[in-house]
Amino acid sequence: MSIIGTIYEDVTTDVLGHIGSWQWLVTFISATLMVPSMLNQYEDMFLLEPPREIECDVSASSSVFNTSLCTYSVLNGTKVYKCTTWHVKFLWMIWFKKSWLIFCDHKIKLLSTTIICRLGLVFGCIIFGLIADSFGRKLAISIDVVAELGFRLILTFCDSESWFLLLIFLRSLFASANIYMGIILTCEIASSSWRTLLNAVVSIPRMLSAVCLVPLANVAPNSETFNFIACIFSASLLILLRWTPESPQWLLYNRGIPKAEKTILRAAKINGIELCSDFKIRPVNHRAYQCLDENWSCVSILTTHNVRILTLTVLVFWIFYFFLWSSLYIRVHNEQQYYGLLKTFCFMVILGFINWSLSKNLKIKMLLTMNLAVIGAASTALVFINLLKFNIPVTNIISPFALAASIIVHALILNITPRLFAINIRATLFGCCYSCGHLGSMICYLIVIFRTVDKVILVIVEAGLAVLLIVLCCVLPDVDGRELPDVMEDMDYFSEYVNKASSMGVSKDQLSVT
């Protein structure tokens, strides 16, 4: 028997079991749908290397002495001219002409493109959160896949600066759902005992994108080729939409009980569970719908003290974390480039195994605190090394190690955050978290690129942020072994669970699975 409106019972788990083929299928589909986030090179475009297999078109000039990507010289190098047209080698075999190249524009254009891309993600994450909470997770995912395919294809052959910047913004706006929607879907189909592991699996593309995004984009000869390859991959994702289910949990709380029954029936067949032909989720009386009529406005979030504190704490946590991560990433990339990122990847694997081993005895919040302490200790060590002017090789290890720890922190907060929010505001608030995170990254980029603070001061700020994040961890509740909060009152983790079954005035006999 399962009851809508309580924090400790789940219809999906009751019918399908704690784990099965269907849960694994949804997890791997969700992880695959998040792969395009690894291919959005515009998020950190100012870190990309100049493209290859692009040649300046000098056919209209005579006596050309030397050429580069952006200029050519004539008359034994005495006169230098800027290139106005280029020949691009597309897919390593087809040449076509372009009249504008962003890498030959002012360097600030690369940073402005990054800011425009991030700004689109700020708005897009919130908008898709509202769409997912209002119309379903699958609709948001479907819009993202189609938009990703269309905008990637147009960007491949875009030859205008104004259109290019507009398309970057629109692509970020309309293709930002799958950054986090797969995590929400996995959360809502997983049982409490398997949710942490399945969330970790589906978060792998986001973890890899933190390290591999820029190197992966630099492997391609030019952005046109990279965009088209990403476009082909996005087209293949259309097939997965056929197997992507709507969240049964979301359907139950949005008066979609018949659709939830069909989804669970199909899932039961995949799991090899036989259900009777008249399987129904039957409300015994209309009081069971009281929880469905709850007011989900932002005012409700702000009027409950503990819910307000929890929400604001999580939003601030994401801003500070993304600022910290962006600062570490830029330093490692600028000082050590590929070798630094290779070290980071190795440290990330090592720390991942260590955290996985410790997770059997420690809670996620404790692991989060430990990794933040590692970042703080590493940043503090760098401060002393810089102040004392030690020139030792260990400095080339500390920064990648701190960056690897920050990526593990990212995986942990991806595991924790969606499990804090009620069903009908989960996607919106999770999207707001990502939006706040991108704002933190943009602030960091502006500070670092324009060098508004000294390098040592920036490292001190990193250490301070790590300590502040540890303090914020104390406010976050434990999510291990808990069911997801169904309604907003369930988000008040700080109150005692005296009336679990009657928290929404719903008794155990009001909604049953038969």
Description of each model-found segment:
Residues P51, I131, L216, L358, ...:
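Hydrophobic alpha-helical transmembrane and interfacial-helix anchor sites in secondary transporters
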Residues S112-L130, G182, L342-S357:
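Central cavity-lining transmembrane alpha-helices of secondary-active solute carriers
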Residues G136, F157-S162, A220-P221, I385-K389:
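Helix-breaking motifs and short loop linkers at transmembrane-helix boundaries and internal kinks
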Residues P50-V80, P221-A288, A463-S502:
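Central mid-sequence intracellular linker of multi-pass
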Residues S2-W24, C70-I108, K269-Y338, Y497-T514:
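Flexible cytoplasmic loops linking transmembrane helices in multi-pass membrane transporters
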Residues M38, S172, I330-H333, Q337-A501:
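C-terminal transmembrane bundle
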Residues L33, S37, G120-L121, A175-Y180, ...:
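Glycine-rich segments within core transmembrane alpha-helices of 12-TM secondary carriers
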Residues F123-I154:
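Conserved MFS/SLC helix-loop-helix module at the cytosolic interface between two early adjacent transmembrane helices
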